[in-house]
């Protein structure tokens, strides 16, 4: 996404970068504008924050874009090439707030600062401008500043590579969070590309421009919008990839890192190169790249991920999502790890059960868990502090975060020692044990209790840590007392009680007396020798002495030396911390793991969740299942308790394929909630969480699909029904016998018979071809007869009661089939006018009477399984109908008398009557 300045992207008559870089432009530019053009030409894909005094100013198209995005005034500054120069600006002191807004909108920003003193510029000549250069590239996927990051969310930069070899191209993804050092790789495929990208949720995706402009992949990048950023294809060169990665890590070979495909190496090297570019060759403390297998995580297609509202609701809010309902973590790292587990549920029962073991152990020991959570609350975000220190952007508080995090880890290790732990918690304890205690001791001995934000402010090294520093501080801090003593001495020598020693930035320290008292200072030779005149004011005179000048030098040198010693100490401690990066990150991950397990244990106790049995079977048996989000919402509202319902999609005895429930029932009866809750229970179980049920036995699901909700896609010319059919097609083409499929109201967006036919065929396909576990909710009650033909299909219904013409929704699922949808009752509850409701009842009665006389189900009941049914219009056509058509075609009304026309009409009627 080059938002900026190609001619095709101009706003009105604003000059593009290409225009600005032309010879004509450069030859007429002022020195300042020439400097701007040169820097802008090297940063075409970024908004340029150009430092001018106390403001960052933006010009030309950058100004137009930024003013619109930030809601700030667009003004102008002079002209260039006969056109006014659009300009806007933001104060330097508030720049981070504006950067945060731009980054959230997907922009990239190049921050340009003065890199020399104005005095140096003057030495080069009168027209020389102060040198400026880009000191920071801020992009959505490469930020590290706390103010620009969400503590509970990862901030991934992702690279997509494609290698053409053989008949099918190979795809791979690499994703890096430079704020925490995470670096992972995975192969993918075109068919699952969007699903894998959305699973990771990168803030920025770089990819070759050739891939970005591939029309076959256009739908993927349309969904991603500004997240997808094309880069030159050479950045993804697989031939040089291994060498680039090796150089970054300072190793001769990647053999010790594991085995990677060409596509994975291409993606990884592109990501690393982009990080180096944006960090201006500074290297964050990235971990060794870890390879993920696609088969190790539950595949959730994009529509399902959105419809189930895992991390965000359909409106984009975190409130109301499953993640919000599950999150009981007390650390930033724990919150990020919980989100990662939710977005990438496992398919390996052994790994899942290790997580469940930890939750069970902590749930069984509530006092221990409470103590651990209290200790965790004192743990700052060590990985992000470490990253800032490694990039040279850290401050004293980042060192303090490492110190406090290590202290919390030591406290938790003491709690864990001697306890009987799960495998996962034992590994976490061992990782914490690997922390360098000597480093913590040095941090404790060095850092003050109260730490400033910026290292240039000083005061972060504790008293007693450095003898010279203590001496210089004493001189600096006692200067006021020394100056006061000197002032008293001069008052006594001169007899001038109003004499004062003052200080300003021009004269430094000076003696000030009134004009009337000045004679006492300079009327004698001794006075003139001792008191040196500095300045005459209207009502006062100012002097200095050799003694005062020497004291001033000592005080100034002491302050400078204090800051120099503190900065030296900071650099030493930073190097020591970064040298232990791997141990610190391992301990931080251990703390996050404990936090997630403890949080889920608290959740299980609080919400009465149970441990699911997870194995490699094809079972799916839920007793007393509840919707985790809806249940908590009802409790907050003090409403009626959630009605629990069971669900058993396990293969019937002797069968290998999963069972399908065909769910019928009224509108507002709870069908959609029931469908979603079972999908969410499967996700929670496989992420390694207890589940909202009285009992649950789940054979791992490899793919989860849902078709619930209805929306159109106008941007791509798709109606609601077309979107529904595309999603249904993906399910029928991709679901396996280990998949879980939930379908809601397939076929409702078209004519009744068309929709019924599609729903019928889809159910058959799921049963006979996919052989998956599934829930299929429908208002096509005719489908319930399929239970007589399909051995693994059962009918279930949402129960209701009728009372005095009203319907009471029980929200209970039971065996059987509904024969009514109670749509008119729901319409009345929604507030439709009484006249409309009454008319609807009359029409419904007539339609139901007609259906009883000639039920459409008679035709459907006779449909053979998986054979092409004769079209309804062909089945309804009598053998003589075509002859009648031929006779009708042969008639020429213009050549017929009225009598002949009447005879012909009777003849046609007779043919039709004899069908």
Swiss-Prot record:
Q: Which UniProt keywords apply?
A: ATP-binding, DNA damage, DNA repair, DNA-binding, Nucleotide-binding
Q: Could you confirm whether the keyword Nucleotide-binding appears in this record?
A: yes
Instruction: Return one Gene Ontology term, BP aspect.
Output: mismatch repair
Q: Which residues form a coiled coil?
A: none
Q: Which SMART domains match?
A: MUTSac, MUTSd
* Cellular component aspect of the GO annotation: cytosol
What superkingdom heads the lineage? Bacteria
Alphabetically, the GO molecular function entries are: ATP binding; ATP-dependent DNA damage sensor activity; damaged DNA binding; mismatched DNA binding
Family according to the record: Belongs to the DNA mismatch repair MutS family.
* UniProt name for this protein: DNA mismatch repair protein MutS
- Gene symbol of the encoding locus: mutS
């Amino acid at each position: 996404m080059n938002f900026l300045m190609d001619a095709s992207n101009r706003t009105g008559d604003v000059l593009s970068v290409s225009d600005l870089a032309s010879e004509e432009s450069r030859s007429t530019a002022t020195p300042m504008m020439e400097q701007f053009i040169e820097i802008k030409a090297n940063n075409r894909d970024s908004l340029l924050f150009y430092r001018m005094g106390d403001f960052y100013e933006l010009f030309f198209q950058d100004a137009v874009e930024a003013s619109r995005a930030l809601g700030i005034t667009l003004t102008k500054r002079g002209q260039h090439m006969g056109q006014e120069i659009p300009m806007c600006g933001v104060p330097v002191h508030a720049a981070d707030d504006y950067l945060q807004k731009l980054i959230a909108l997907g922009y990239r920003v190049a921050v340009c600062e003065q890199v020399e003193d104005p005095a140096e510029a003057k030495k080069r000549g009168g027209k020389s401008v102060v040198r400026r250069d880009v000191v920071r590239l801020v992009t959505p996927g490469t930020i590290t500043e706390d103010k620009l990051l969400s503590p509970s969310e990862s901030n991934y930069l992702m690279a997509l590579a494609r290698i053409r070899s053989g008949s099918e191209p190979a795809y791979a993804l690499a994703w890096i969070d430079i704020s925490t050092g995470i670096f992972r790789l995975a192969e993918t495929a075109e068919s699952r590309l969007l699903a894998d990208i959305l699973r990771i949720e990168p803030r920025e995706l770089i990819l070759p421009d050739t891939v970005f402009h591939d029309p076959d992949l256009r739908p993927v990048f349309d969904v991603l919008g500004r997240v997808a950023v094309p880069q030159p294809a050479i950045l993804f060169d697989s031939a040089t990839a291994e060498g680039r990665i090796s150089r970054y890590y300072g190793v001769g070979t990647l053999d010790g890192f594991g085995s990677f495909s060409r596509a994975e190496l291409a993606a990884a090297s592109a990501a690393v190169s982009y990080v180096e570019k944006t960090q201006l060759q500074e290297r964050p403390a990235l971990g060794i790249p870890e390879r993920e297998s696609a088969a190790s995580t539950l595949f959730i297609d994009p529509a399902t991920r959105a419809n189930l509202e895992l991390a965000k609701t359909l409106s984009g809010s975190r409130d109301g999502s499953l993640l919000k309902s599950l999150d009981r973590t007390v650390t930033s790292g724990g919150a990020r790890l919980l989100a990662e587990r939710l977005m990438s549920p496992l398919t390996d029962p052994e790994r899942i059960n290790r997580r469940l073991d930890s939750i069970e152990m902590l749930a069984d020991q509530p006092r221990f868990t409470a103590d651990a959570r209290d200790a965790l609350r004192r743990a700052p975000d060590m990985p992000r502090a470490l990253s800032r220190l490694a990039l040279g952007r850290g401050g004293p508080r980042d060192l303090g975060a490492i110190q406090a995090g290590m202290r919390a880890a030591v406290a938790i290790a003491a709690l864990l020692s001697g306890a009987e732990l799960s495998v996962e918690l034992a590994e976490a304890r061992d990782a914490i044990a690997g922390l360098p205690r000597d480093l913590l001791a040095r941090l404790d001995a060095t850092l003050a209790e109260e730490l400033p934000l910026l290292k240039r402010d000083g005061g972060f090294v504790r008293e007693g840590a450095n003898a010279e520093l203590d001496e210089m501080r004493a001189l600096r801090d006692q200067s006021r007392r020394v100056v006061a003593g000197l002032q008293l001495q001069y008052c006594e020598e001169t007899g001038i009680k109003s004499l004062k020693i003052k200080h300003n930035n021009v004269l430094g320290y000076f003696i000030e007396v009134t004009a009337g008292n000045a004679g006492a200072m300079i009327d004698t030779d001794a006075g003139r020798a001792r008191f040196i005149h500095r300045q005459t004011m209207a009502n006062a005179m100012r002097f200095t002495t050799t003694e005062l000048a020497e004291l001033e030098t000592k005080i100034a040198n002491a302050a400078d030396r204090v800051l120099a010693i503190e900065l030296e100490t900071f650099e030493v401690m930073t190097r020591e911390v970064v040298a232990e990066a791997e141990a610190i990150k391992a301990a931080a991950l251990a703390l996050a793991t404990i936090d997630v397990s403890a949080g889920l244990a608290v959740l299980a106790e609080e919400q009465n969740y149970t441990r699911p049995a997870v194995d490699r079977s094809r079972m799916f048996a839920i007793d007393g299942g509840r919707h985790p989000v809806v249940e908590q919402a009802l409790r907050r509202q003090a409403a009626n308790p959630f009605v629990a319902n069971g669900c058993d999609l396990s293969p019937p005895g002797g069968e290998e394929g999963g069972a399908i429930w065909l769910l019928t029932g009224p509108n507002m009866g709870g069908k959609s909630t029931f469908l979603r809750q079972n999908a969410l229970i499967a996700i929670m179980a496989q992420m390694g969480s207890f589940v909202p049920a009285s009992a649950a036995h789940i054979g791992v699901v490899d793919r989860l699909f849902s078709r619930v909700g209805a929306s159109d896609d106008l941007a791509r010319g798709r109606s609601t029904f077309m979107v529904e059919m595309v999603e249904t097609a993906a399910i029928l083409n991709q679901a396996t016998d280990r998949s879980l499929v939930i379908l809601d109201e397939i076929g409702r967006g078209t004519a009744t018979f068309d929709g019924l036919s599609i729903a019928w065929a889809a159910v058959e396909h799921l049963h006979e071809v996919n052989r998956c576990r599934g829930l299929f909710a429908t208002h096509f009650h005719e489908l319930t007869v399929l239970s007589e033909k399909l051995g693994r299909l059962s009918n279930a219904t949402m129960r209701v009661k009728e009372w005095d013409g009203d319907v009471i929704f029980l929200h209970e699922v039971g065996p059987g089939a509904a024969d009514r949808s109670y749509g008119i009752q729901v319409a009345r509850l929604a507030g439709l006018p009484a006249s409309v409701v009454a008319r609807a009842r009359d029409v419904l009665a007539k339609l139901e009477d007609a259906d009883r006389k000639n039920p459409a189900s008679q035709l459907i009941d006779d449909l053979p399984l998986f054979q092409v049914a004769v079209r309804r219009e062909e089945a309804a056509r009598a053998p003589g109908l075509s002859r009648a058509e031929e006779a009708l075609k042969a008639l020429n009304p213009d050549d017929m008398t009225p009598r002949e026309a009447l005879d012909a009409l009777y003849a046609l009627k007779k043919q039709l009557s004899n069908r």
